[in-house]
């Protein structure tokens, strides 16, 4: 009986590997290239920056999963081969696909320290043609990135080379010896894999649930290695796509029964300006050595808050967090409680949304990146007006709004939200050429940077200065009215500040990384008419400029300023309220692999960072 089992085992289990041994090796190699590369890079980075600065990648579990996936691919190819000889074409196609995936994985890790995940597909979905071309010119056409296509060529070469290699091996050694070797190795791999899967299933039966993917901080880090397997990445992406649709419907449900009203003396106009990718350490108002806030620095009644951070380093999650009345550290998800524009509209405000990025006719309503508030069950409950076009530069967006402003803001009180492009994606495309103020020659003291890297920093600072002029223009539009203007960015960005890196990366790479990607400007302007009518609010604002704050609590600050009474208002979360909890933990929830980070624990009391490195 044991002999019969052994024969059947060899026939059913080992036959695919014996028929396609070299293909099995190539598939496994393609799956393991990102694992080997990221493990090596993480170890080197840990040695350079210290053991606590980088989350070491756990890849043992991933390797076992990748071996199993390789076996599945080969088995499918073998079965197709037995049926109609189509199997070899299937395997070649799988190898080509895995080559592309390997290239993408290495590109994402090198440029953003990220893996393939649902956020990548969200980013692609929110990106328009203009931003796509900017992304390609900024990241794809870099000399350093030319190494990735070479991987595909090497793999194709190995495909041909190893067919010859295995043919030589077969001719040199007896067939029974080769079969015995393959049988032993394959048996060992399969037994280890099945044992691992059994233990994994017993200990972590709930790991693949939707609730687990949300509550990533409760997962034992010993099991995070599983999430790095390609199979899990595909599964988790599909799961999150499904969850997104449910989340949007839950968000719409939360807007059905809103109870809100204005109590006391409200304000005629509340203007919110949302910037993009603004690292406050590049603002001269915050001590930067380049005059990037030339225009705002000349405005009176300007309150500059110096300890405000974004709740996450991505646009989609940031919007979800600061629009929702549910905070990140609460027991509720963003979709469980109403979004503040809907509460303002219910209270009687005319709510305007004027965006240079999120435009209804160019957004997918199922995308949490940009379209969820354009869903038919949500939009009309949130906004009285939304624009239909976007522009190359933010100045054009504001110029167009000035033409329709009297009509759009005819009713009062108004809540006006302007969403700018700011320094988004490629900063060299964010300002007109006649607004060039800084050049690479101005960064002669940054000897650690190449000319191209200096040019990027100059473009980022030019985009910051242009953004400053746009904010000043918006303030000028309302300065004669009873108005409070609040400016903040959705998140920060890196511009070769403490390393050669552009854009954003993971949140587990130390204090400097958090400072660049999460430290944002938060500025409040009060008109003369406002200061005369609301002296108590002025006093509260003046006393709160040094308080620690995270933008997920923005709705409660707005309710306080607008004198809106609603059950979702929490005084301890309002930045200017006397009951404000300044000791609140500012928790940043990263992606599935990173877990959560306590910003204040990592960065301490240091709200400044030094730009430059040696």
Map each language-model feature to its residues.
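Histidine-centered active-site/metal-ligand motif
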Residues: 282, 419, 423-425, 491, ...
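Active-site rim elements
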Residues: 55, 221, 327-331, 385-389, ...
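Short beta-strand segments
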Residues: 353-355, 415-422, 461-464, 484-489, ...
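Active-site-proximal alpha/beta segments of enzymes that process anionic O-linked groups
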Residues: 199-447, 519, 551, 556-577
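Metal-dependent active-site segment of extracytoplasmic phospho-/sulfohydrolases and closely related
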Residues: 271, 463-506, 558-562
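Membrane-interface soluble catalytic domains
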Residues: 14-26, 89, 160, 164-167, ...
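A long, amphipathic alpha-helix that forms part
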Residues: 253-259, 399-405, 442-486, 509, ...
């Amino acid at each position: 009986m044991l002999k019969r089992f052994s024969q059947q085992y060899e026939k059913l289990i080992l036959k695919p590997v014996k028929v396609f041994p070299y293909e099995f090796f190539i598939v496994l190699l393609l799956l393991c290239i990102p694992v080997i590369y990221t493990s090596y890079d993480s170890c080197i980075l840990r040695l350079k920056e210290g053991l606590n600065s980088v989350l070491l990648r756990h890849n043992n579990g991933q390797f076992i999963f990748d071996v199993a996936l390789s076996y599945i691919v080969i088995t499918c190819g073998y079965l197709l081969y037995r049926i109609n000889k189509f199997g070899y074409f299937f395997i070649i196609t799988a190898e080509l696909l895995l080559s592309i995936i390997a290239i993408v994985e290495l590109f994402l890790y090198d440029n953003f320290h990220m893996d393939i995940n649902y956020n990548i597909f969200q980013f692609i979905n929110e990106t328009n043609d203009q931003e796509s071309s900017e992304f390609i010119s900024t990241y794809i056409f870099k000399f350093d990135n030319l190494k990735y296509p070479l991987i595909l060529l090497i793999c194709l070469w190995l495909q041909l080379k190893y067919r010859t290699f295995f043919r030589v091996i077969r001719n040199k050694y007896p067939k029974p010896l080769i079969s015995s070797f393959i049988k032993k190795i394959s048996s060992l791999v399969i037994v280890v894999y099945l044992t691992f899967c059994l233990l994994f299933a017993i200990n972590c039966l709930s790991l693949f649930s939707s609730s687990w993917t949300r509550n990533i901080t409760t997962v034992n880090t010993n099991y995070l290695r599983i999430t790095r397997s390609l199979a899990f990445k595909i599964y988790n992406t599909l799961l999150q796509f499904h969850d997104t649709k449910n989340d949007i419907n839950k968000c719409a449900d939360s807007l059905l029964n809103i109870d809100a009203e204005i109590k006391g003396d409200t304000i005629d106009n509340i203007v919110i300006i949302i910037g993009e990718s603004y690292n406050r350490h590049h603002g001269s108002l915050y001590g930067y050595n380049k005059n990037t806030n030339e225009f705002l620095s000349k405005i009176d009644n300007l309150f500059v808050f110096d300890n405000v951070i974004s709740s996450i380093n991505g646009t989609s999650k940031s919007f979800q967090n600061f629009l929702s009345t549910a905070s990140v550290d609460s027991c509720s998800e963003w979709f469980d409680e109403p979004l503040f524009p809907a509460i303002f509209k219910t209270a009687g405000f005319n709510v305007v949304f004027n965006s240079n990025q999120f435009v209804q006719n160019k957004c997918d309503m199922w995308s949490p990146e940009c379209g969820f508030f354009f869903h038919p069950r949500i939009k009309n409950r949130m906004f009285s007006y939304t624009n239909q076009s976007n522009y190359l530069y933010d100045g054009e967006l504001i110029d167009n709004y000035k033409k329709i402003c009297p009509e759009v803001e005819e009713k009062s009180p108004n809540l006006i939200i302007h969403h700018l492009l700011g320094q988004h994606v490629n900063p060299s495309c964010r300002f007109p050429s006649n607004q060039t103020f800084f050049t690479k020659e101005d960064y002669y003291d940054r000897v650690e940077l190449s000319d191209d890297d200096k040019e990027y920093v100059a473009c980022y600072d030019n985009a910051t200065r242009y953004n400053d002029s746009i904010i000043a223009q918006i303030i000028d539009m309302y300065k004669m009215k009873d108005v409070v203007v609040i400016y903040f960015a959705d998140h920060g960005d890196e511009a070769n500040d403490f390393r050669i890196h552009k854009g954003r990366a993971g949140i587990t790479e130390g204090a400097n990384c958090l400072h660049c990607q999460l430290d944002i400007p938060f500025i409040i302007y009060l008109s003369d008419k406002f200061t005369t009518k609301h002296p108590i609010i002025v006093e509260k604002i003046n006393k709160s400029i040094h308080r620690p704050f995270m933008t997920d609590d923005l709705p409660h600050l707005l309710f306080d300023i607008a004198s809106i009474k609603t059950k979702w208002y929490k005084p301890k979360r309002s930045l200017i309220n006397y009951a404000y909890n300044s000791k609140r933990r500012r928790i940043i929830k990263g992606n599935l692999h990173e877990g959560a980070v306590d910003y204040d624990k990592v960065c301490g009391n240091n709200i400044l960072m030094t730009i430059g490195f040696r």
